[in-house]
Each structure stands twice: as structure tokens, then as C-alpha cells.
Swiss-Prot record:
PPIases accelerate the folding of proteins. It catalyzes the cis-trans isomerization of proline imidic peptide bonds in oligopeptides. Its main location: cytoplasm. InterPro entries: Cyclophilin-like_dom_sf, Cyclophilin-type_PPIase, Cyclophilin-type_PPIase_CS, Cyclophilin-type_PPIase_dom. This is Peptidyl-prolyl cis-trans isomerase. GO terms for cellular component: cytoplasm; cytosol; nucleus. The gene is ppi1.
């Protein structure tokens, strides 16, 4: 199992670190994409990108490092890659799952659940979970709104593997 981290800031102020365990054994291709985007080893990735959509009692979405508004991003396999499988369910808060625009449109955008979200099962690939820093997830969640607009610029300041 790989572990990755995000050091998160809001309007330039540190919020703390989120650590993720990736489910390499179940979704190796999806996990490898996220890990490489955390390390920046391909020359691009999550460092400096924002959580552009945050909905309290639902999720935090980020990973659009090309446009910053939810319309961009790219994977290490090209712009998009197929859904690997739907073996893991959205059955608890703190899960890491791929955001998409329909079947087989995974790129770099991801979301972190803050509640159980079973309606996403079979549509979004779960590939990891928060192991440390759920308090940081909650801080980010508190800066969101029902529309998803954020009340601060929430940035992944640093990221990588641990």
C-alpha cells in the first residue's frame, strides 16, 4: 500500500496535512496515477492546485491542475483513462475517489468524501482513504458551500509520498 500526503493552505494560511492510504492491491492503475501526480515525477501534478469545489456534508473536489475550475486535468496515461473497477464502495467518510464526466473519463480530478455516498457506487472509482488529517478535511469542508463555491483559495501547497 502506498501512502501519499497533501499539505493544505487556505488563503496562504496552513490548515495541516492529509495522509492517504492508496488501495494499490485493488486498483493499481488508478492508485499509480494519483501517486505520480502527488510526486510530480512526470513533470506535472497536484502541487499548487486547488480544491475548486467543496460541498459540506458531501465532498471536497480537487485535482484540476491545468485549468483550476473542474474542466481540466490529465492523467499519467494521457488525458483520460478507463474506470479500473468498482470493487470498493463509498461506504464511509474519508474515501478518495475519482471525479469524472461519465464512464471511462478519469483524469486527475478526485474527491474526498465527508459522508457515506452510496449513490456514487458503480460510477466513481474508490482508490484510497484518509488515514491522518480528517480534521484538515473538516476544515476544508467548512470553507465550502451548497453550490460548491469556496470561501477561500484552498491550495495543495506540497504533496508527495510518505
Amino acid at each position: 500500500m502506498s501512502n501519499c500526503f497533501f499539505d493544505v493552505i487556505a488563503n496562504g494560511q496552513p490548515l495541516g496535512r492529509i495522509v492517504f492510504k492508496l488501495f494499490d492491491d485493488v486498483v493499481p492503475k488508478t492508485a499509480a496515477n494519483f501517486r505520480a501526480l502527488c510526486t510530480g515525477e512526470k513533470g506535472y501534478g497536484y502541487a499548487g492546485s486547488t480544491f475548486h469545489r467543496v460541498i459540506p456534508q458531501f465532498m471536497l473536489q480537487g485535482g484540476d491542475f491545468t485549468r483550476g475550475n473542474g474542466t481540466g486535468g490529465k492523467s499519467i496515461y494521457g488525458e483520460k483513462f478507463p474506470d479500473e473497477n468498482f470493487a470498493l464502495k463509498h461506504n464511509k467518510p474519508g474515501l478518495l475517489s475519482m471525479a469524472n464526466a461519465g464512464p471511462n473519463t478519469n483524469g486527475s480530478q478526485f474527491f474526498i468524501t465527508t459522508v457515506v455516498t452510496p449513490w456514487l457506487d458503480g460510477k466513481h472509482v474508490v482508490f484510497g482513504e484518509v488515514t491522518e488529517g480528517m480534521d484538515v478535511v473538516k476544515k476544508v469542508e467548512s470553507l465550502g458551500s451548497n453550490s460548491g463555491a469556496t470561501r477561500a483559495r484552498i491550495v495543495i501547497d506540497k504533496c508527495g509520498t510518505v
